[in-house]
Amino acid sequence: MSLDGYCNHDAFNPDEELLQNFNDLFTEADTIVFGRVTYQLMENSWPQIVINPTGMKAFDDFAVLIDNISKIVFSNTLKNVSWKNSRLVTRDLKEEVIYLKQQSGKNILVGGPGLIATLSQPCLIDEYRLYVHPIVLGNGLPLFKNISESINLKLTESKILGAGVVKLNYVPV
């Protein structure tokens, strides 16, 4: 996320330290929920790195982790998904996440600003892990678009990573 709250995967180049943070996050989870746009962006990148590793450990490890994790994809336009361990879901996002949270297993990750905003009200997100990049974009997809009520949060962790990225963990209070 940019300093002004926008998400744009093309604007950020993750370094080894940032990807290692993502690797740690993915190790604690067994499911990720995607919208169509984020799913297609990830599907077009990471499976190829599994086949042809870059030689950069954190990148290659992340490719394997995201390739192996269970991927739940929400879309009104996709007819099928082909990436390994992916499942297309057409039922209500909130209902599906409530169902997933009731199952045993590890953490559930949410990928994509639209889904994060939708799941923030009602409070279906247990923890926000934000990575703020030192750039002001001025436009793009806002992380918390269409939030109609304030959400009080408590900071549980902060850390400055390489390249000036700040990791912020918050829980709703």
Where are these regions (language model features)?
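Enzymes that bind and transform nitrogen-containing heteroaromatic metabolites
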Residues: 1-173
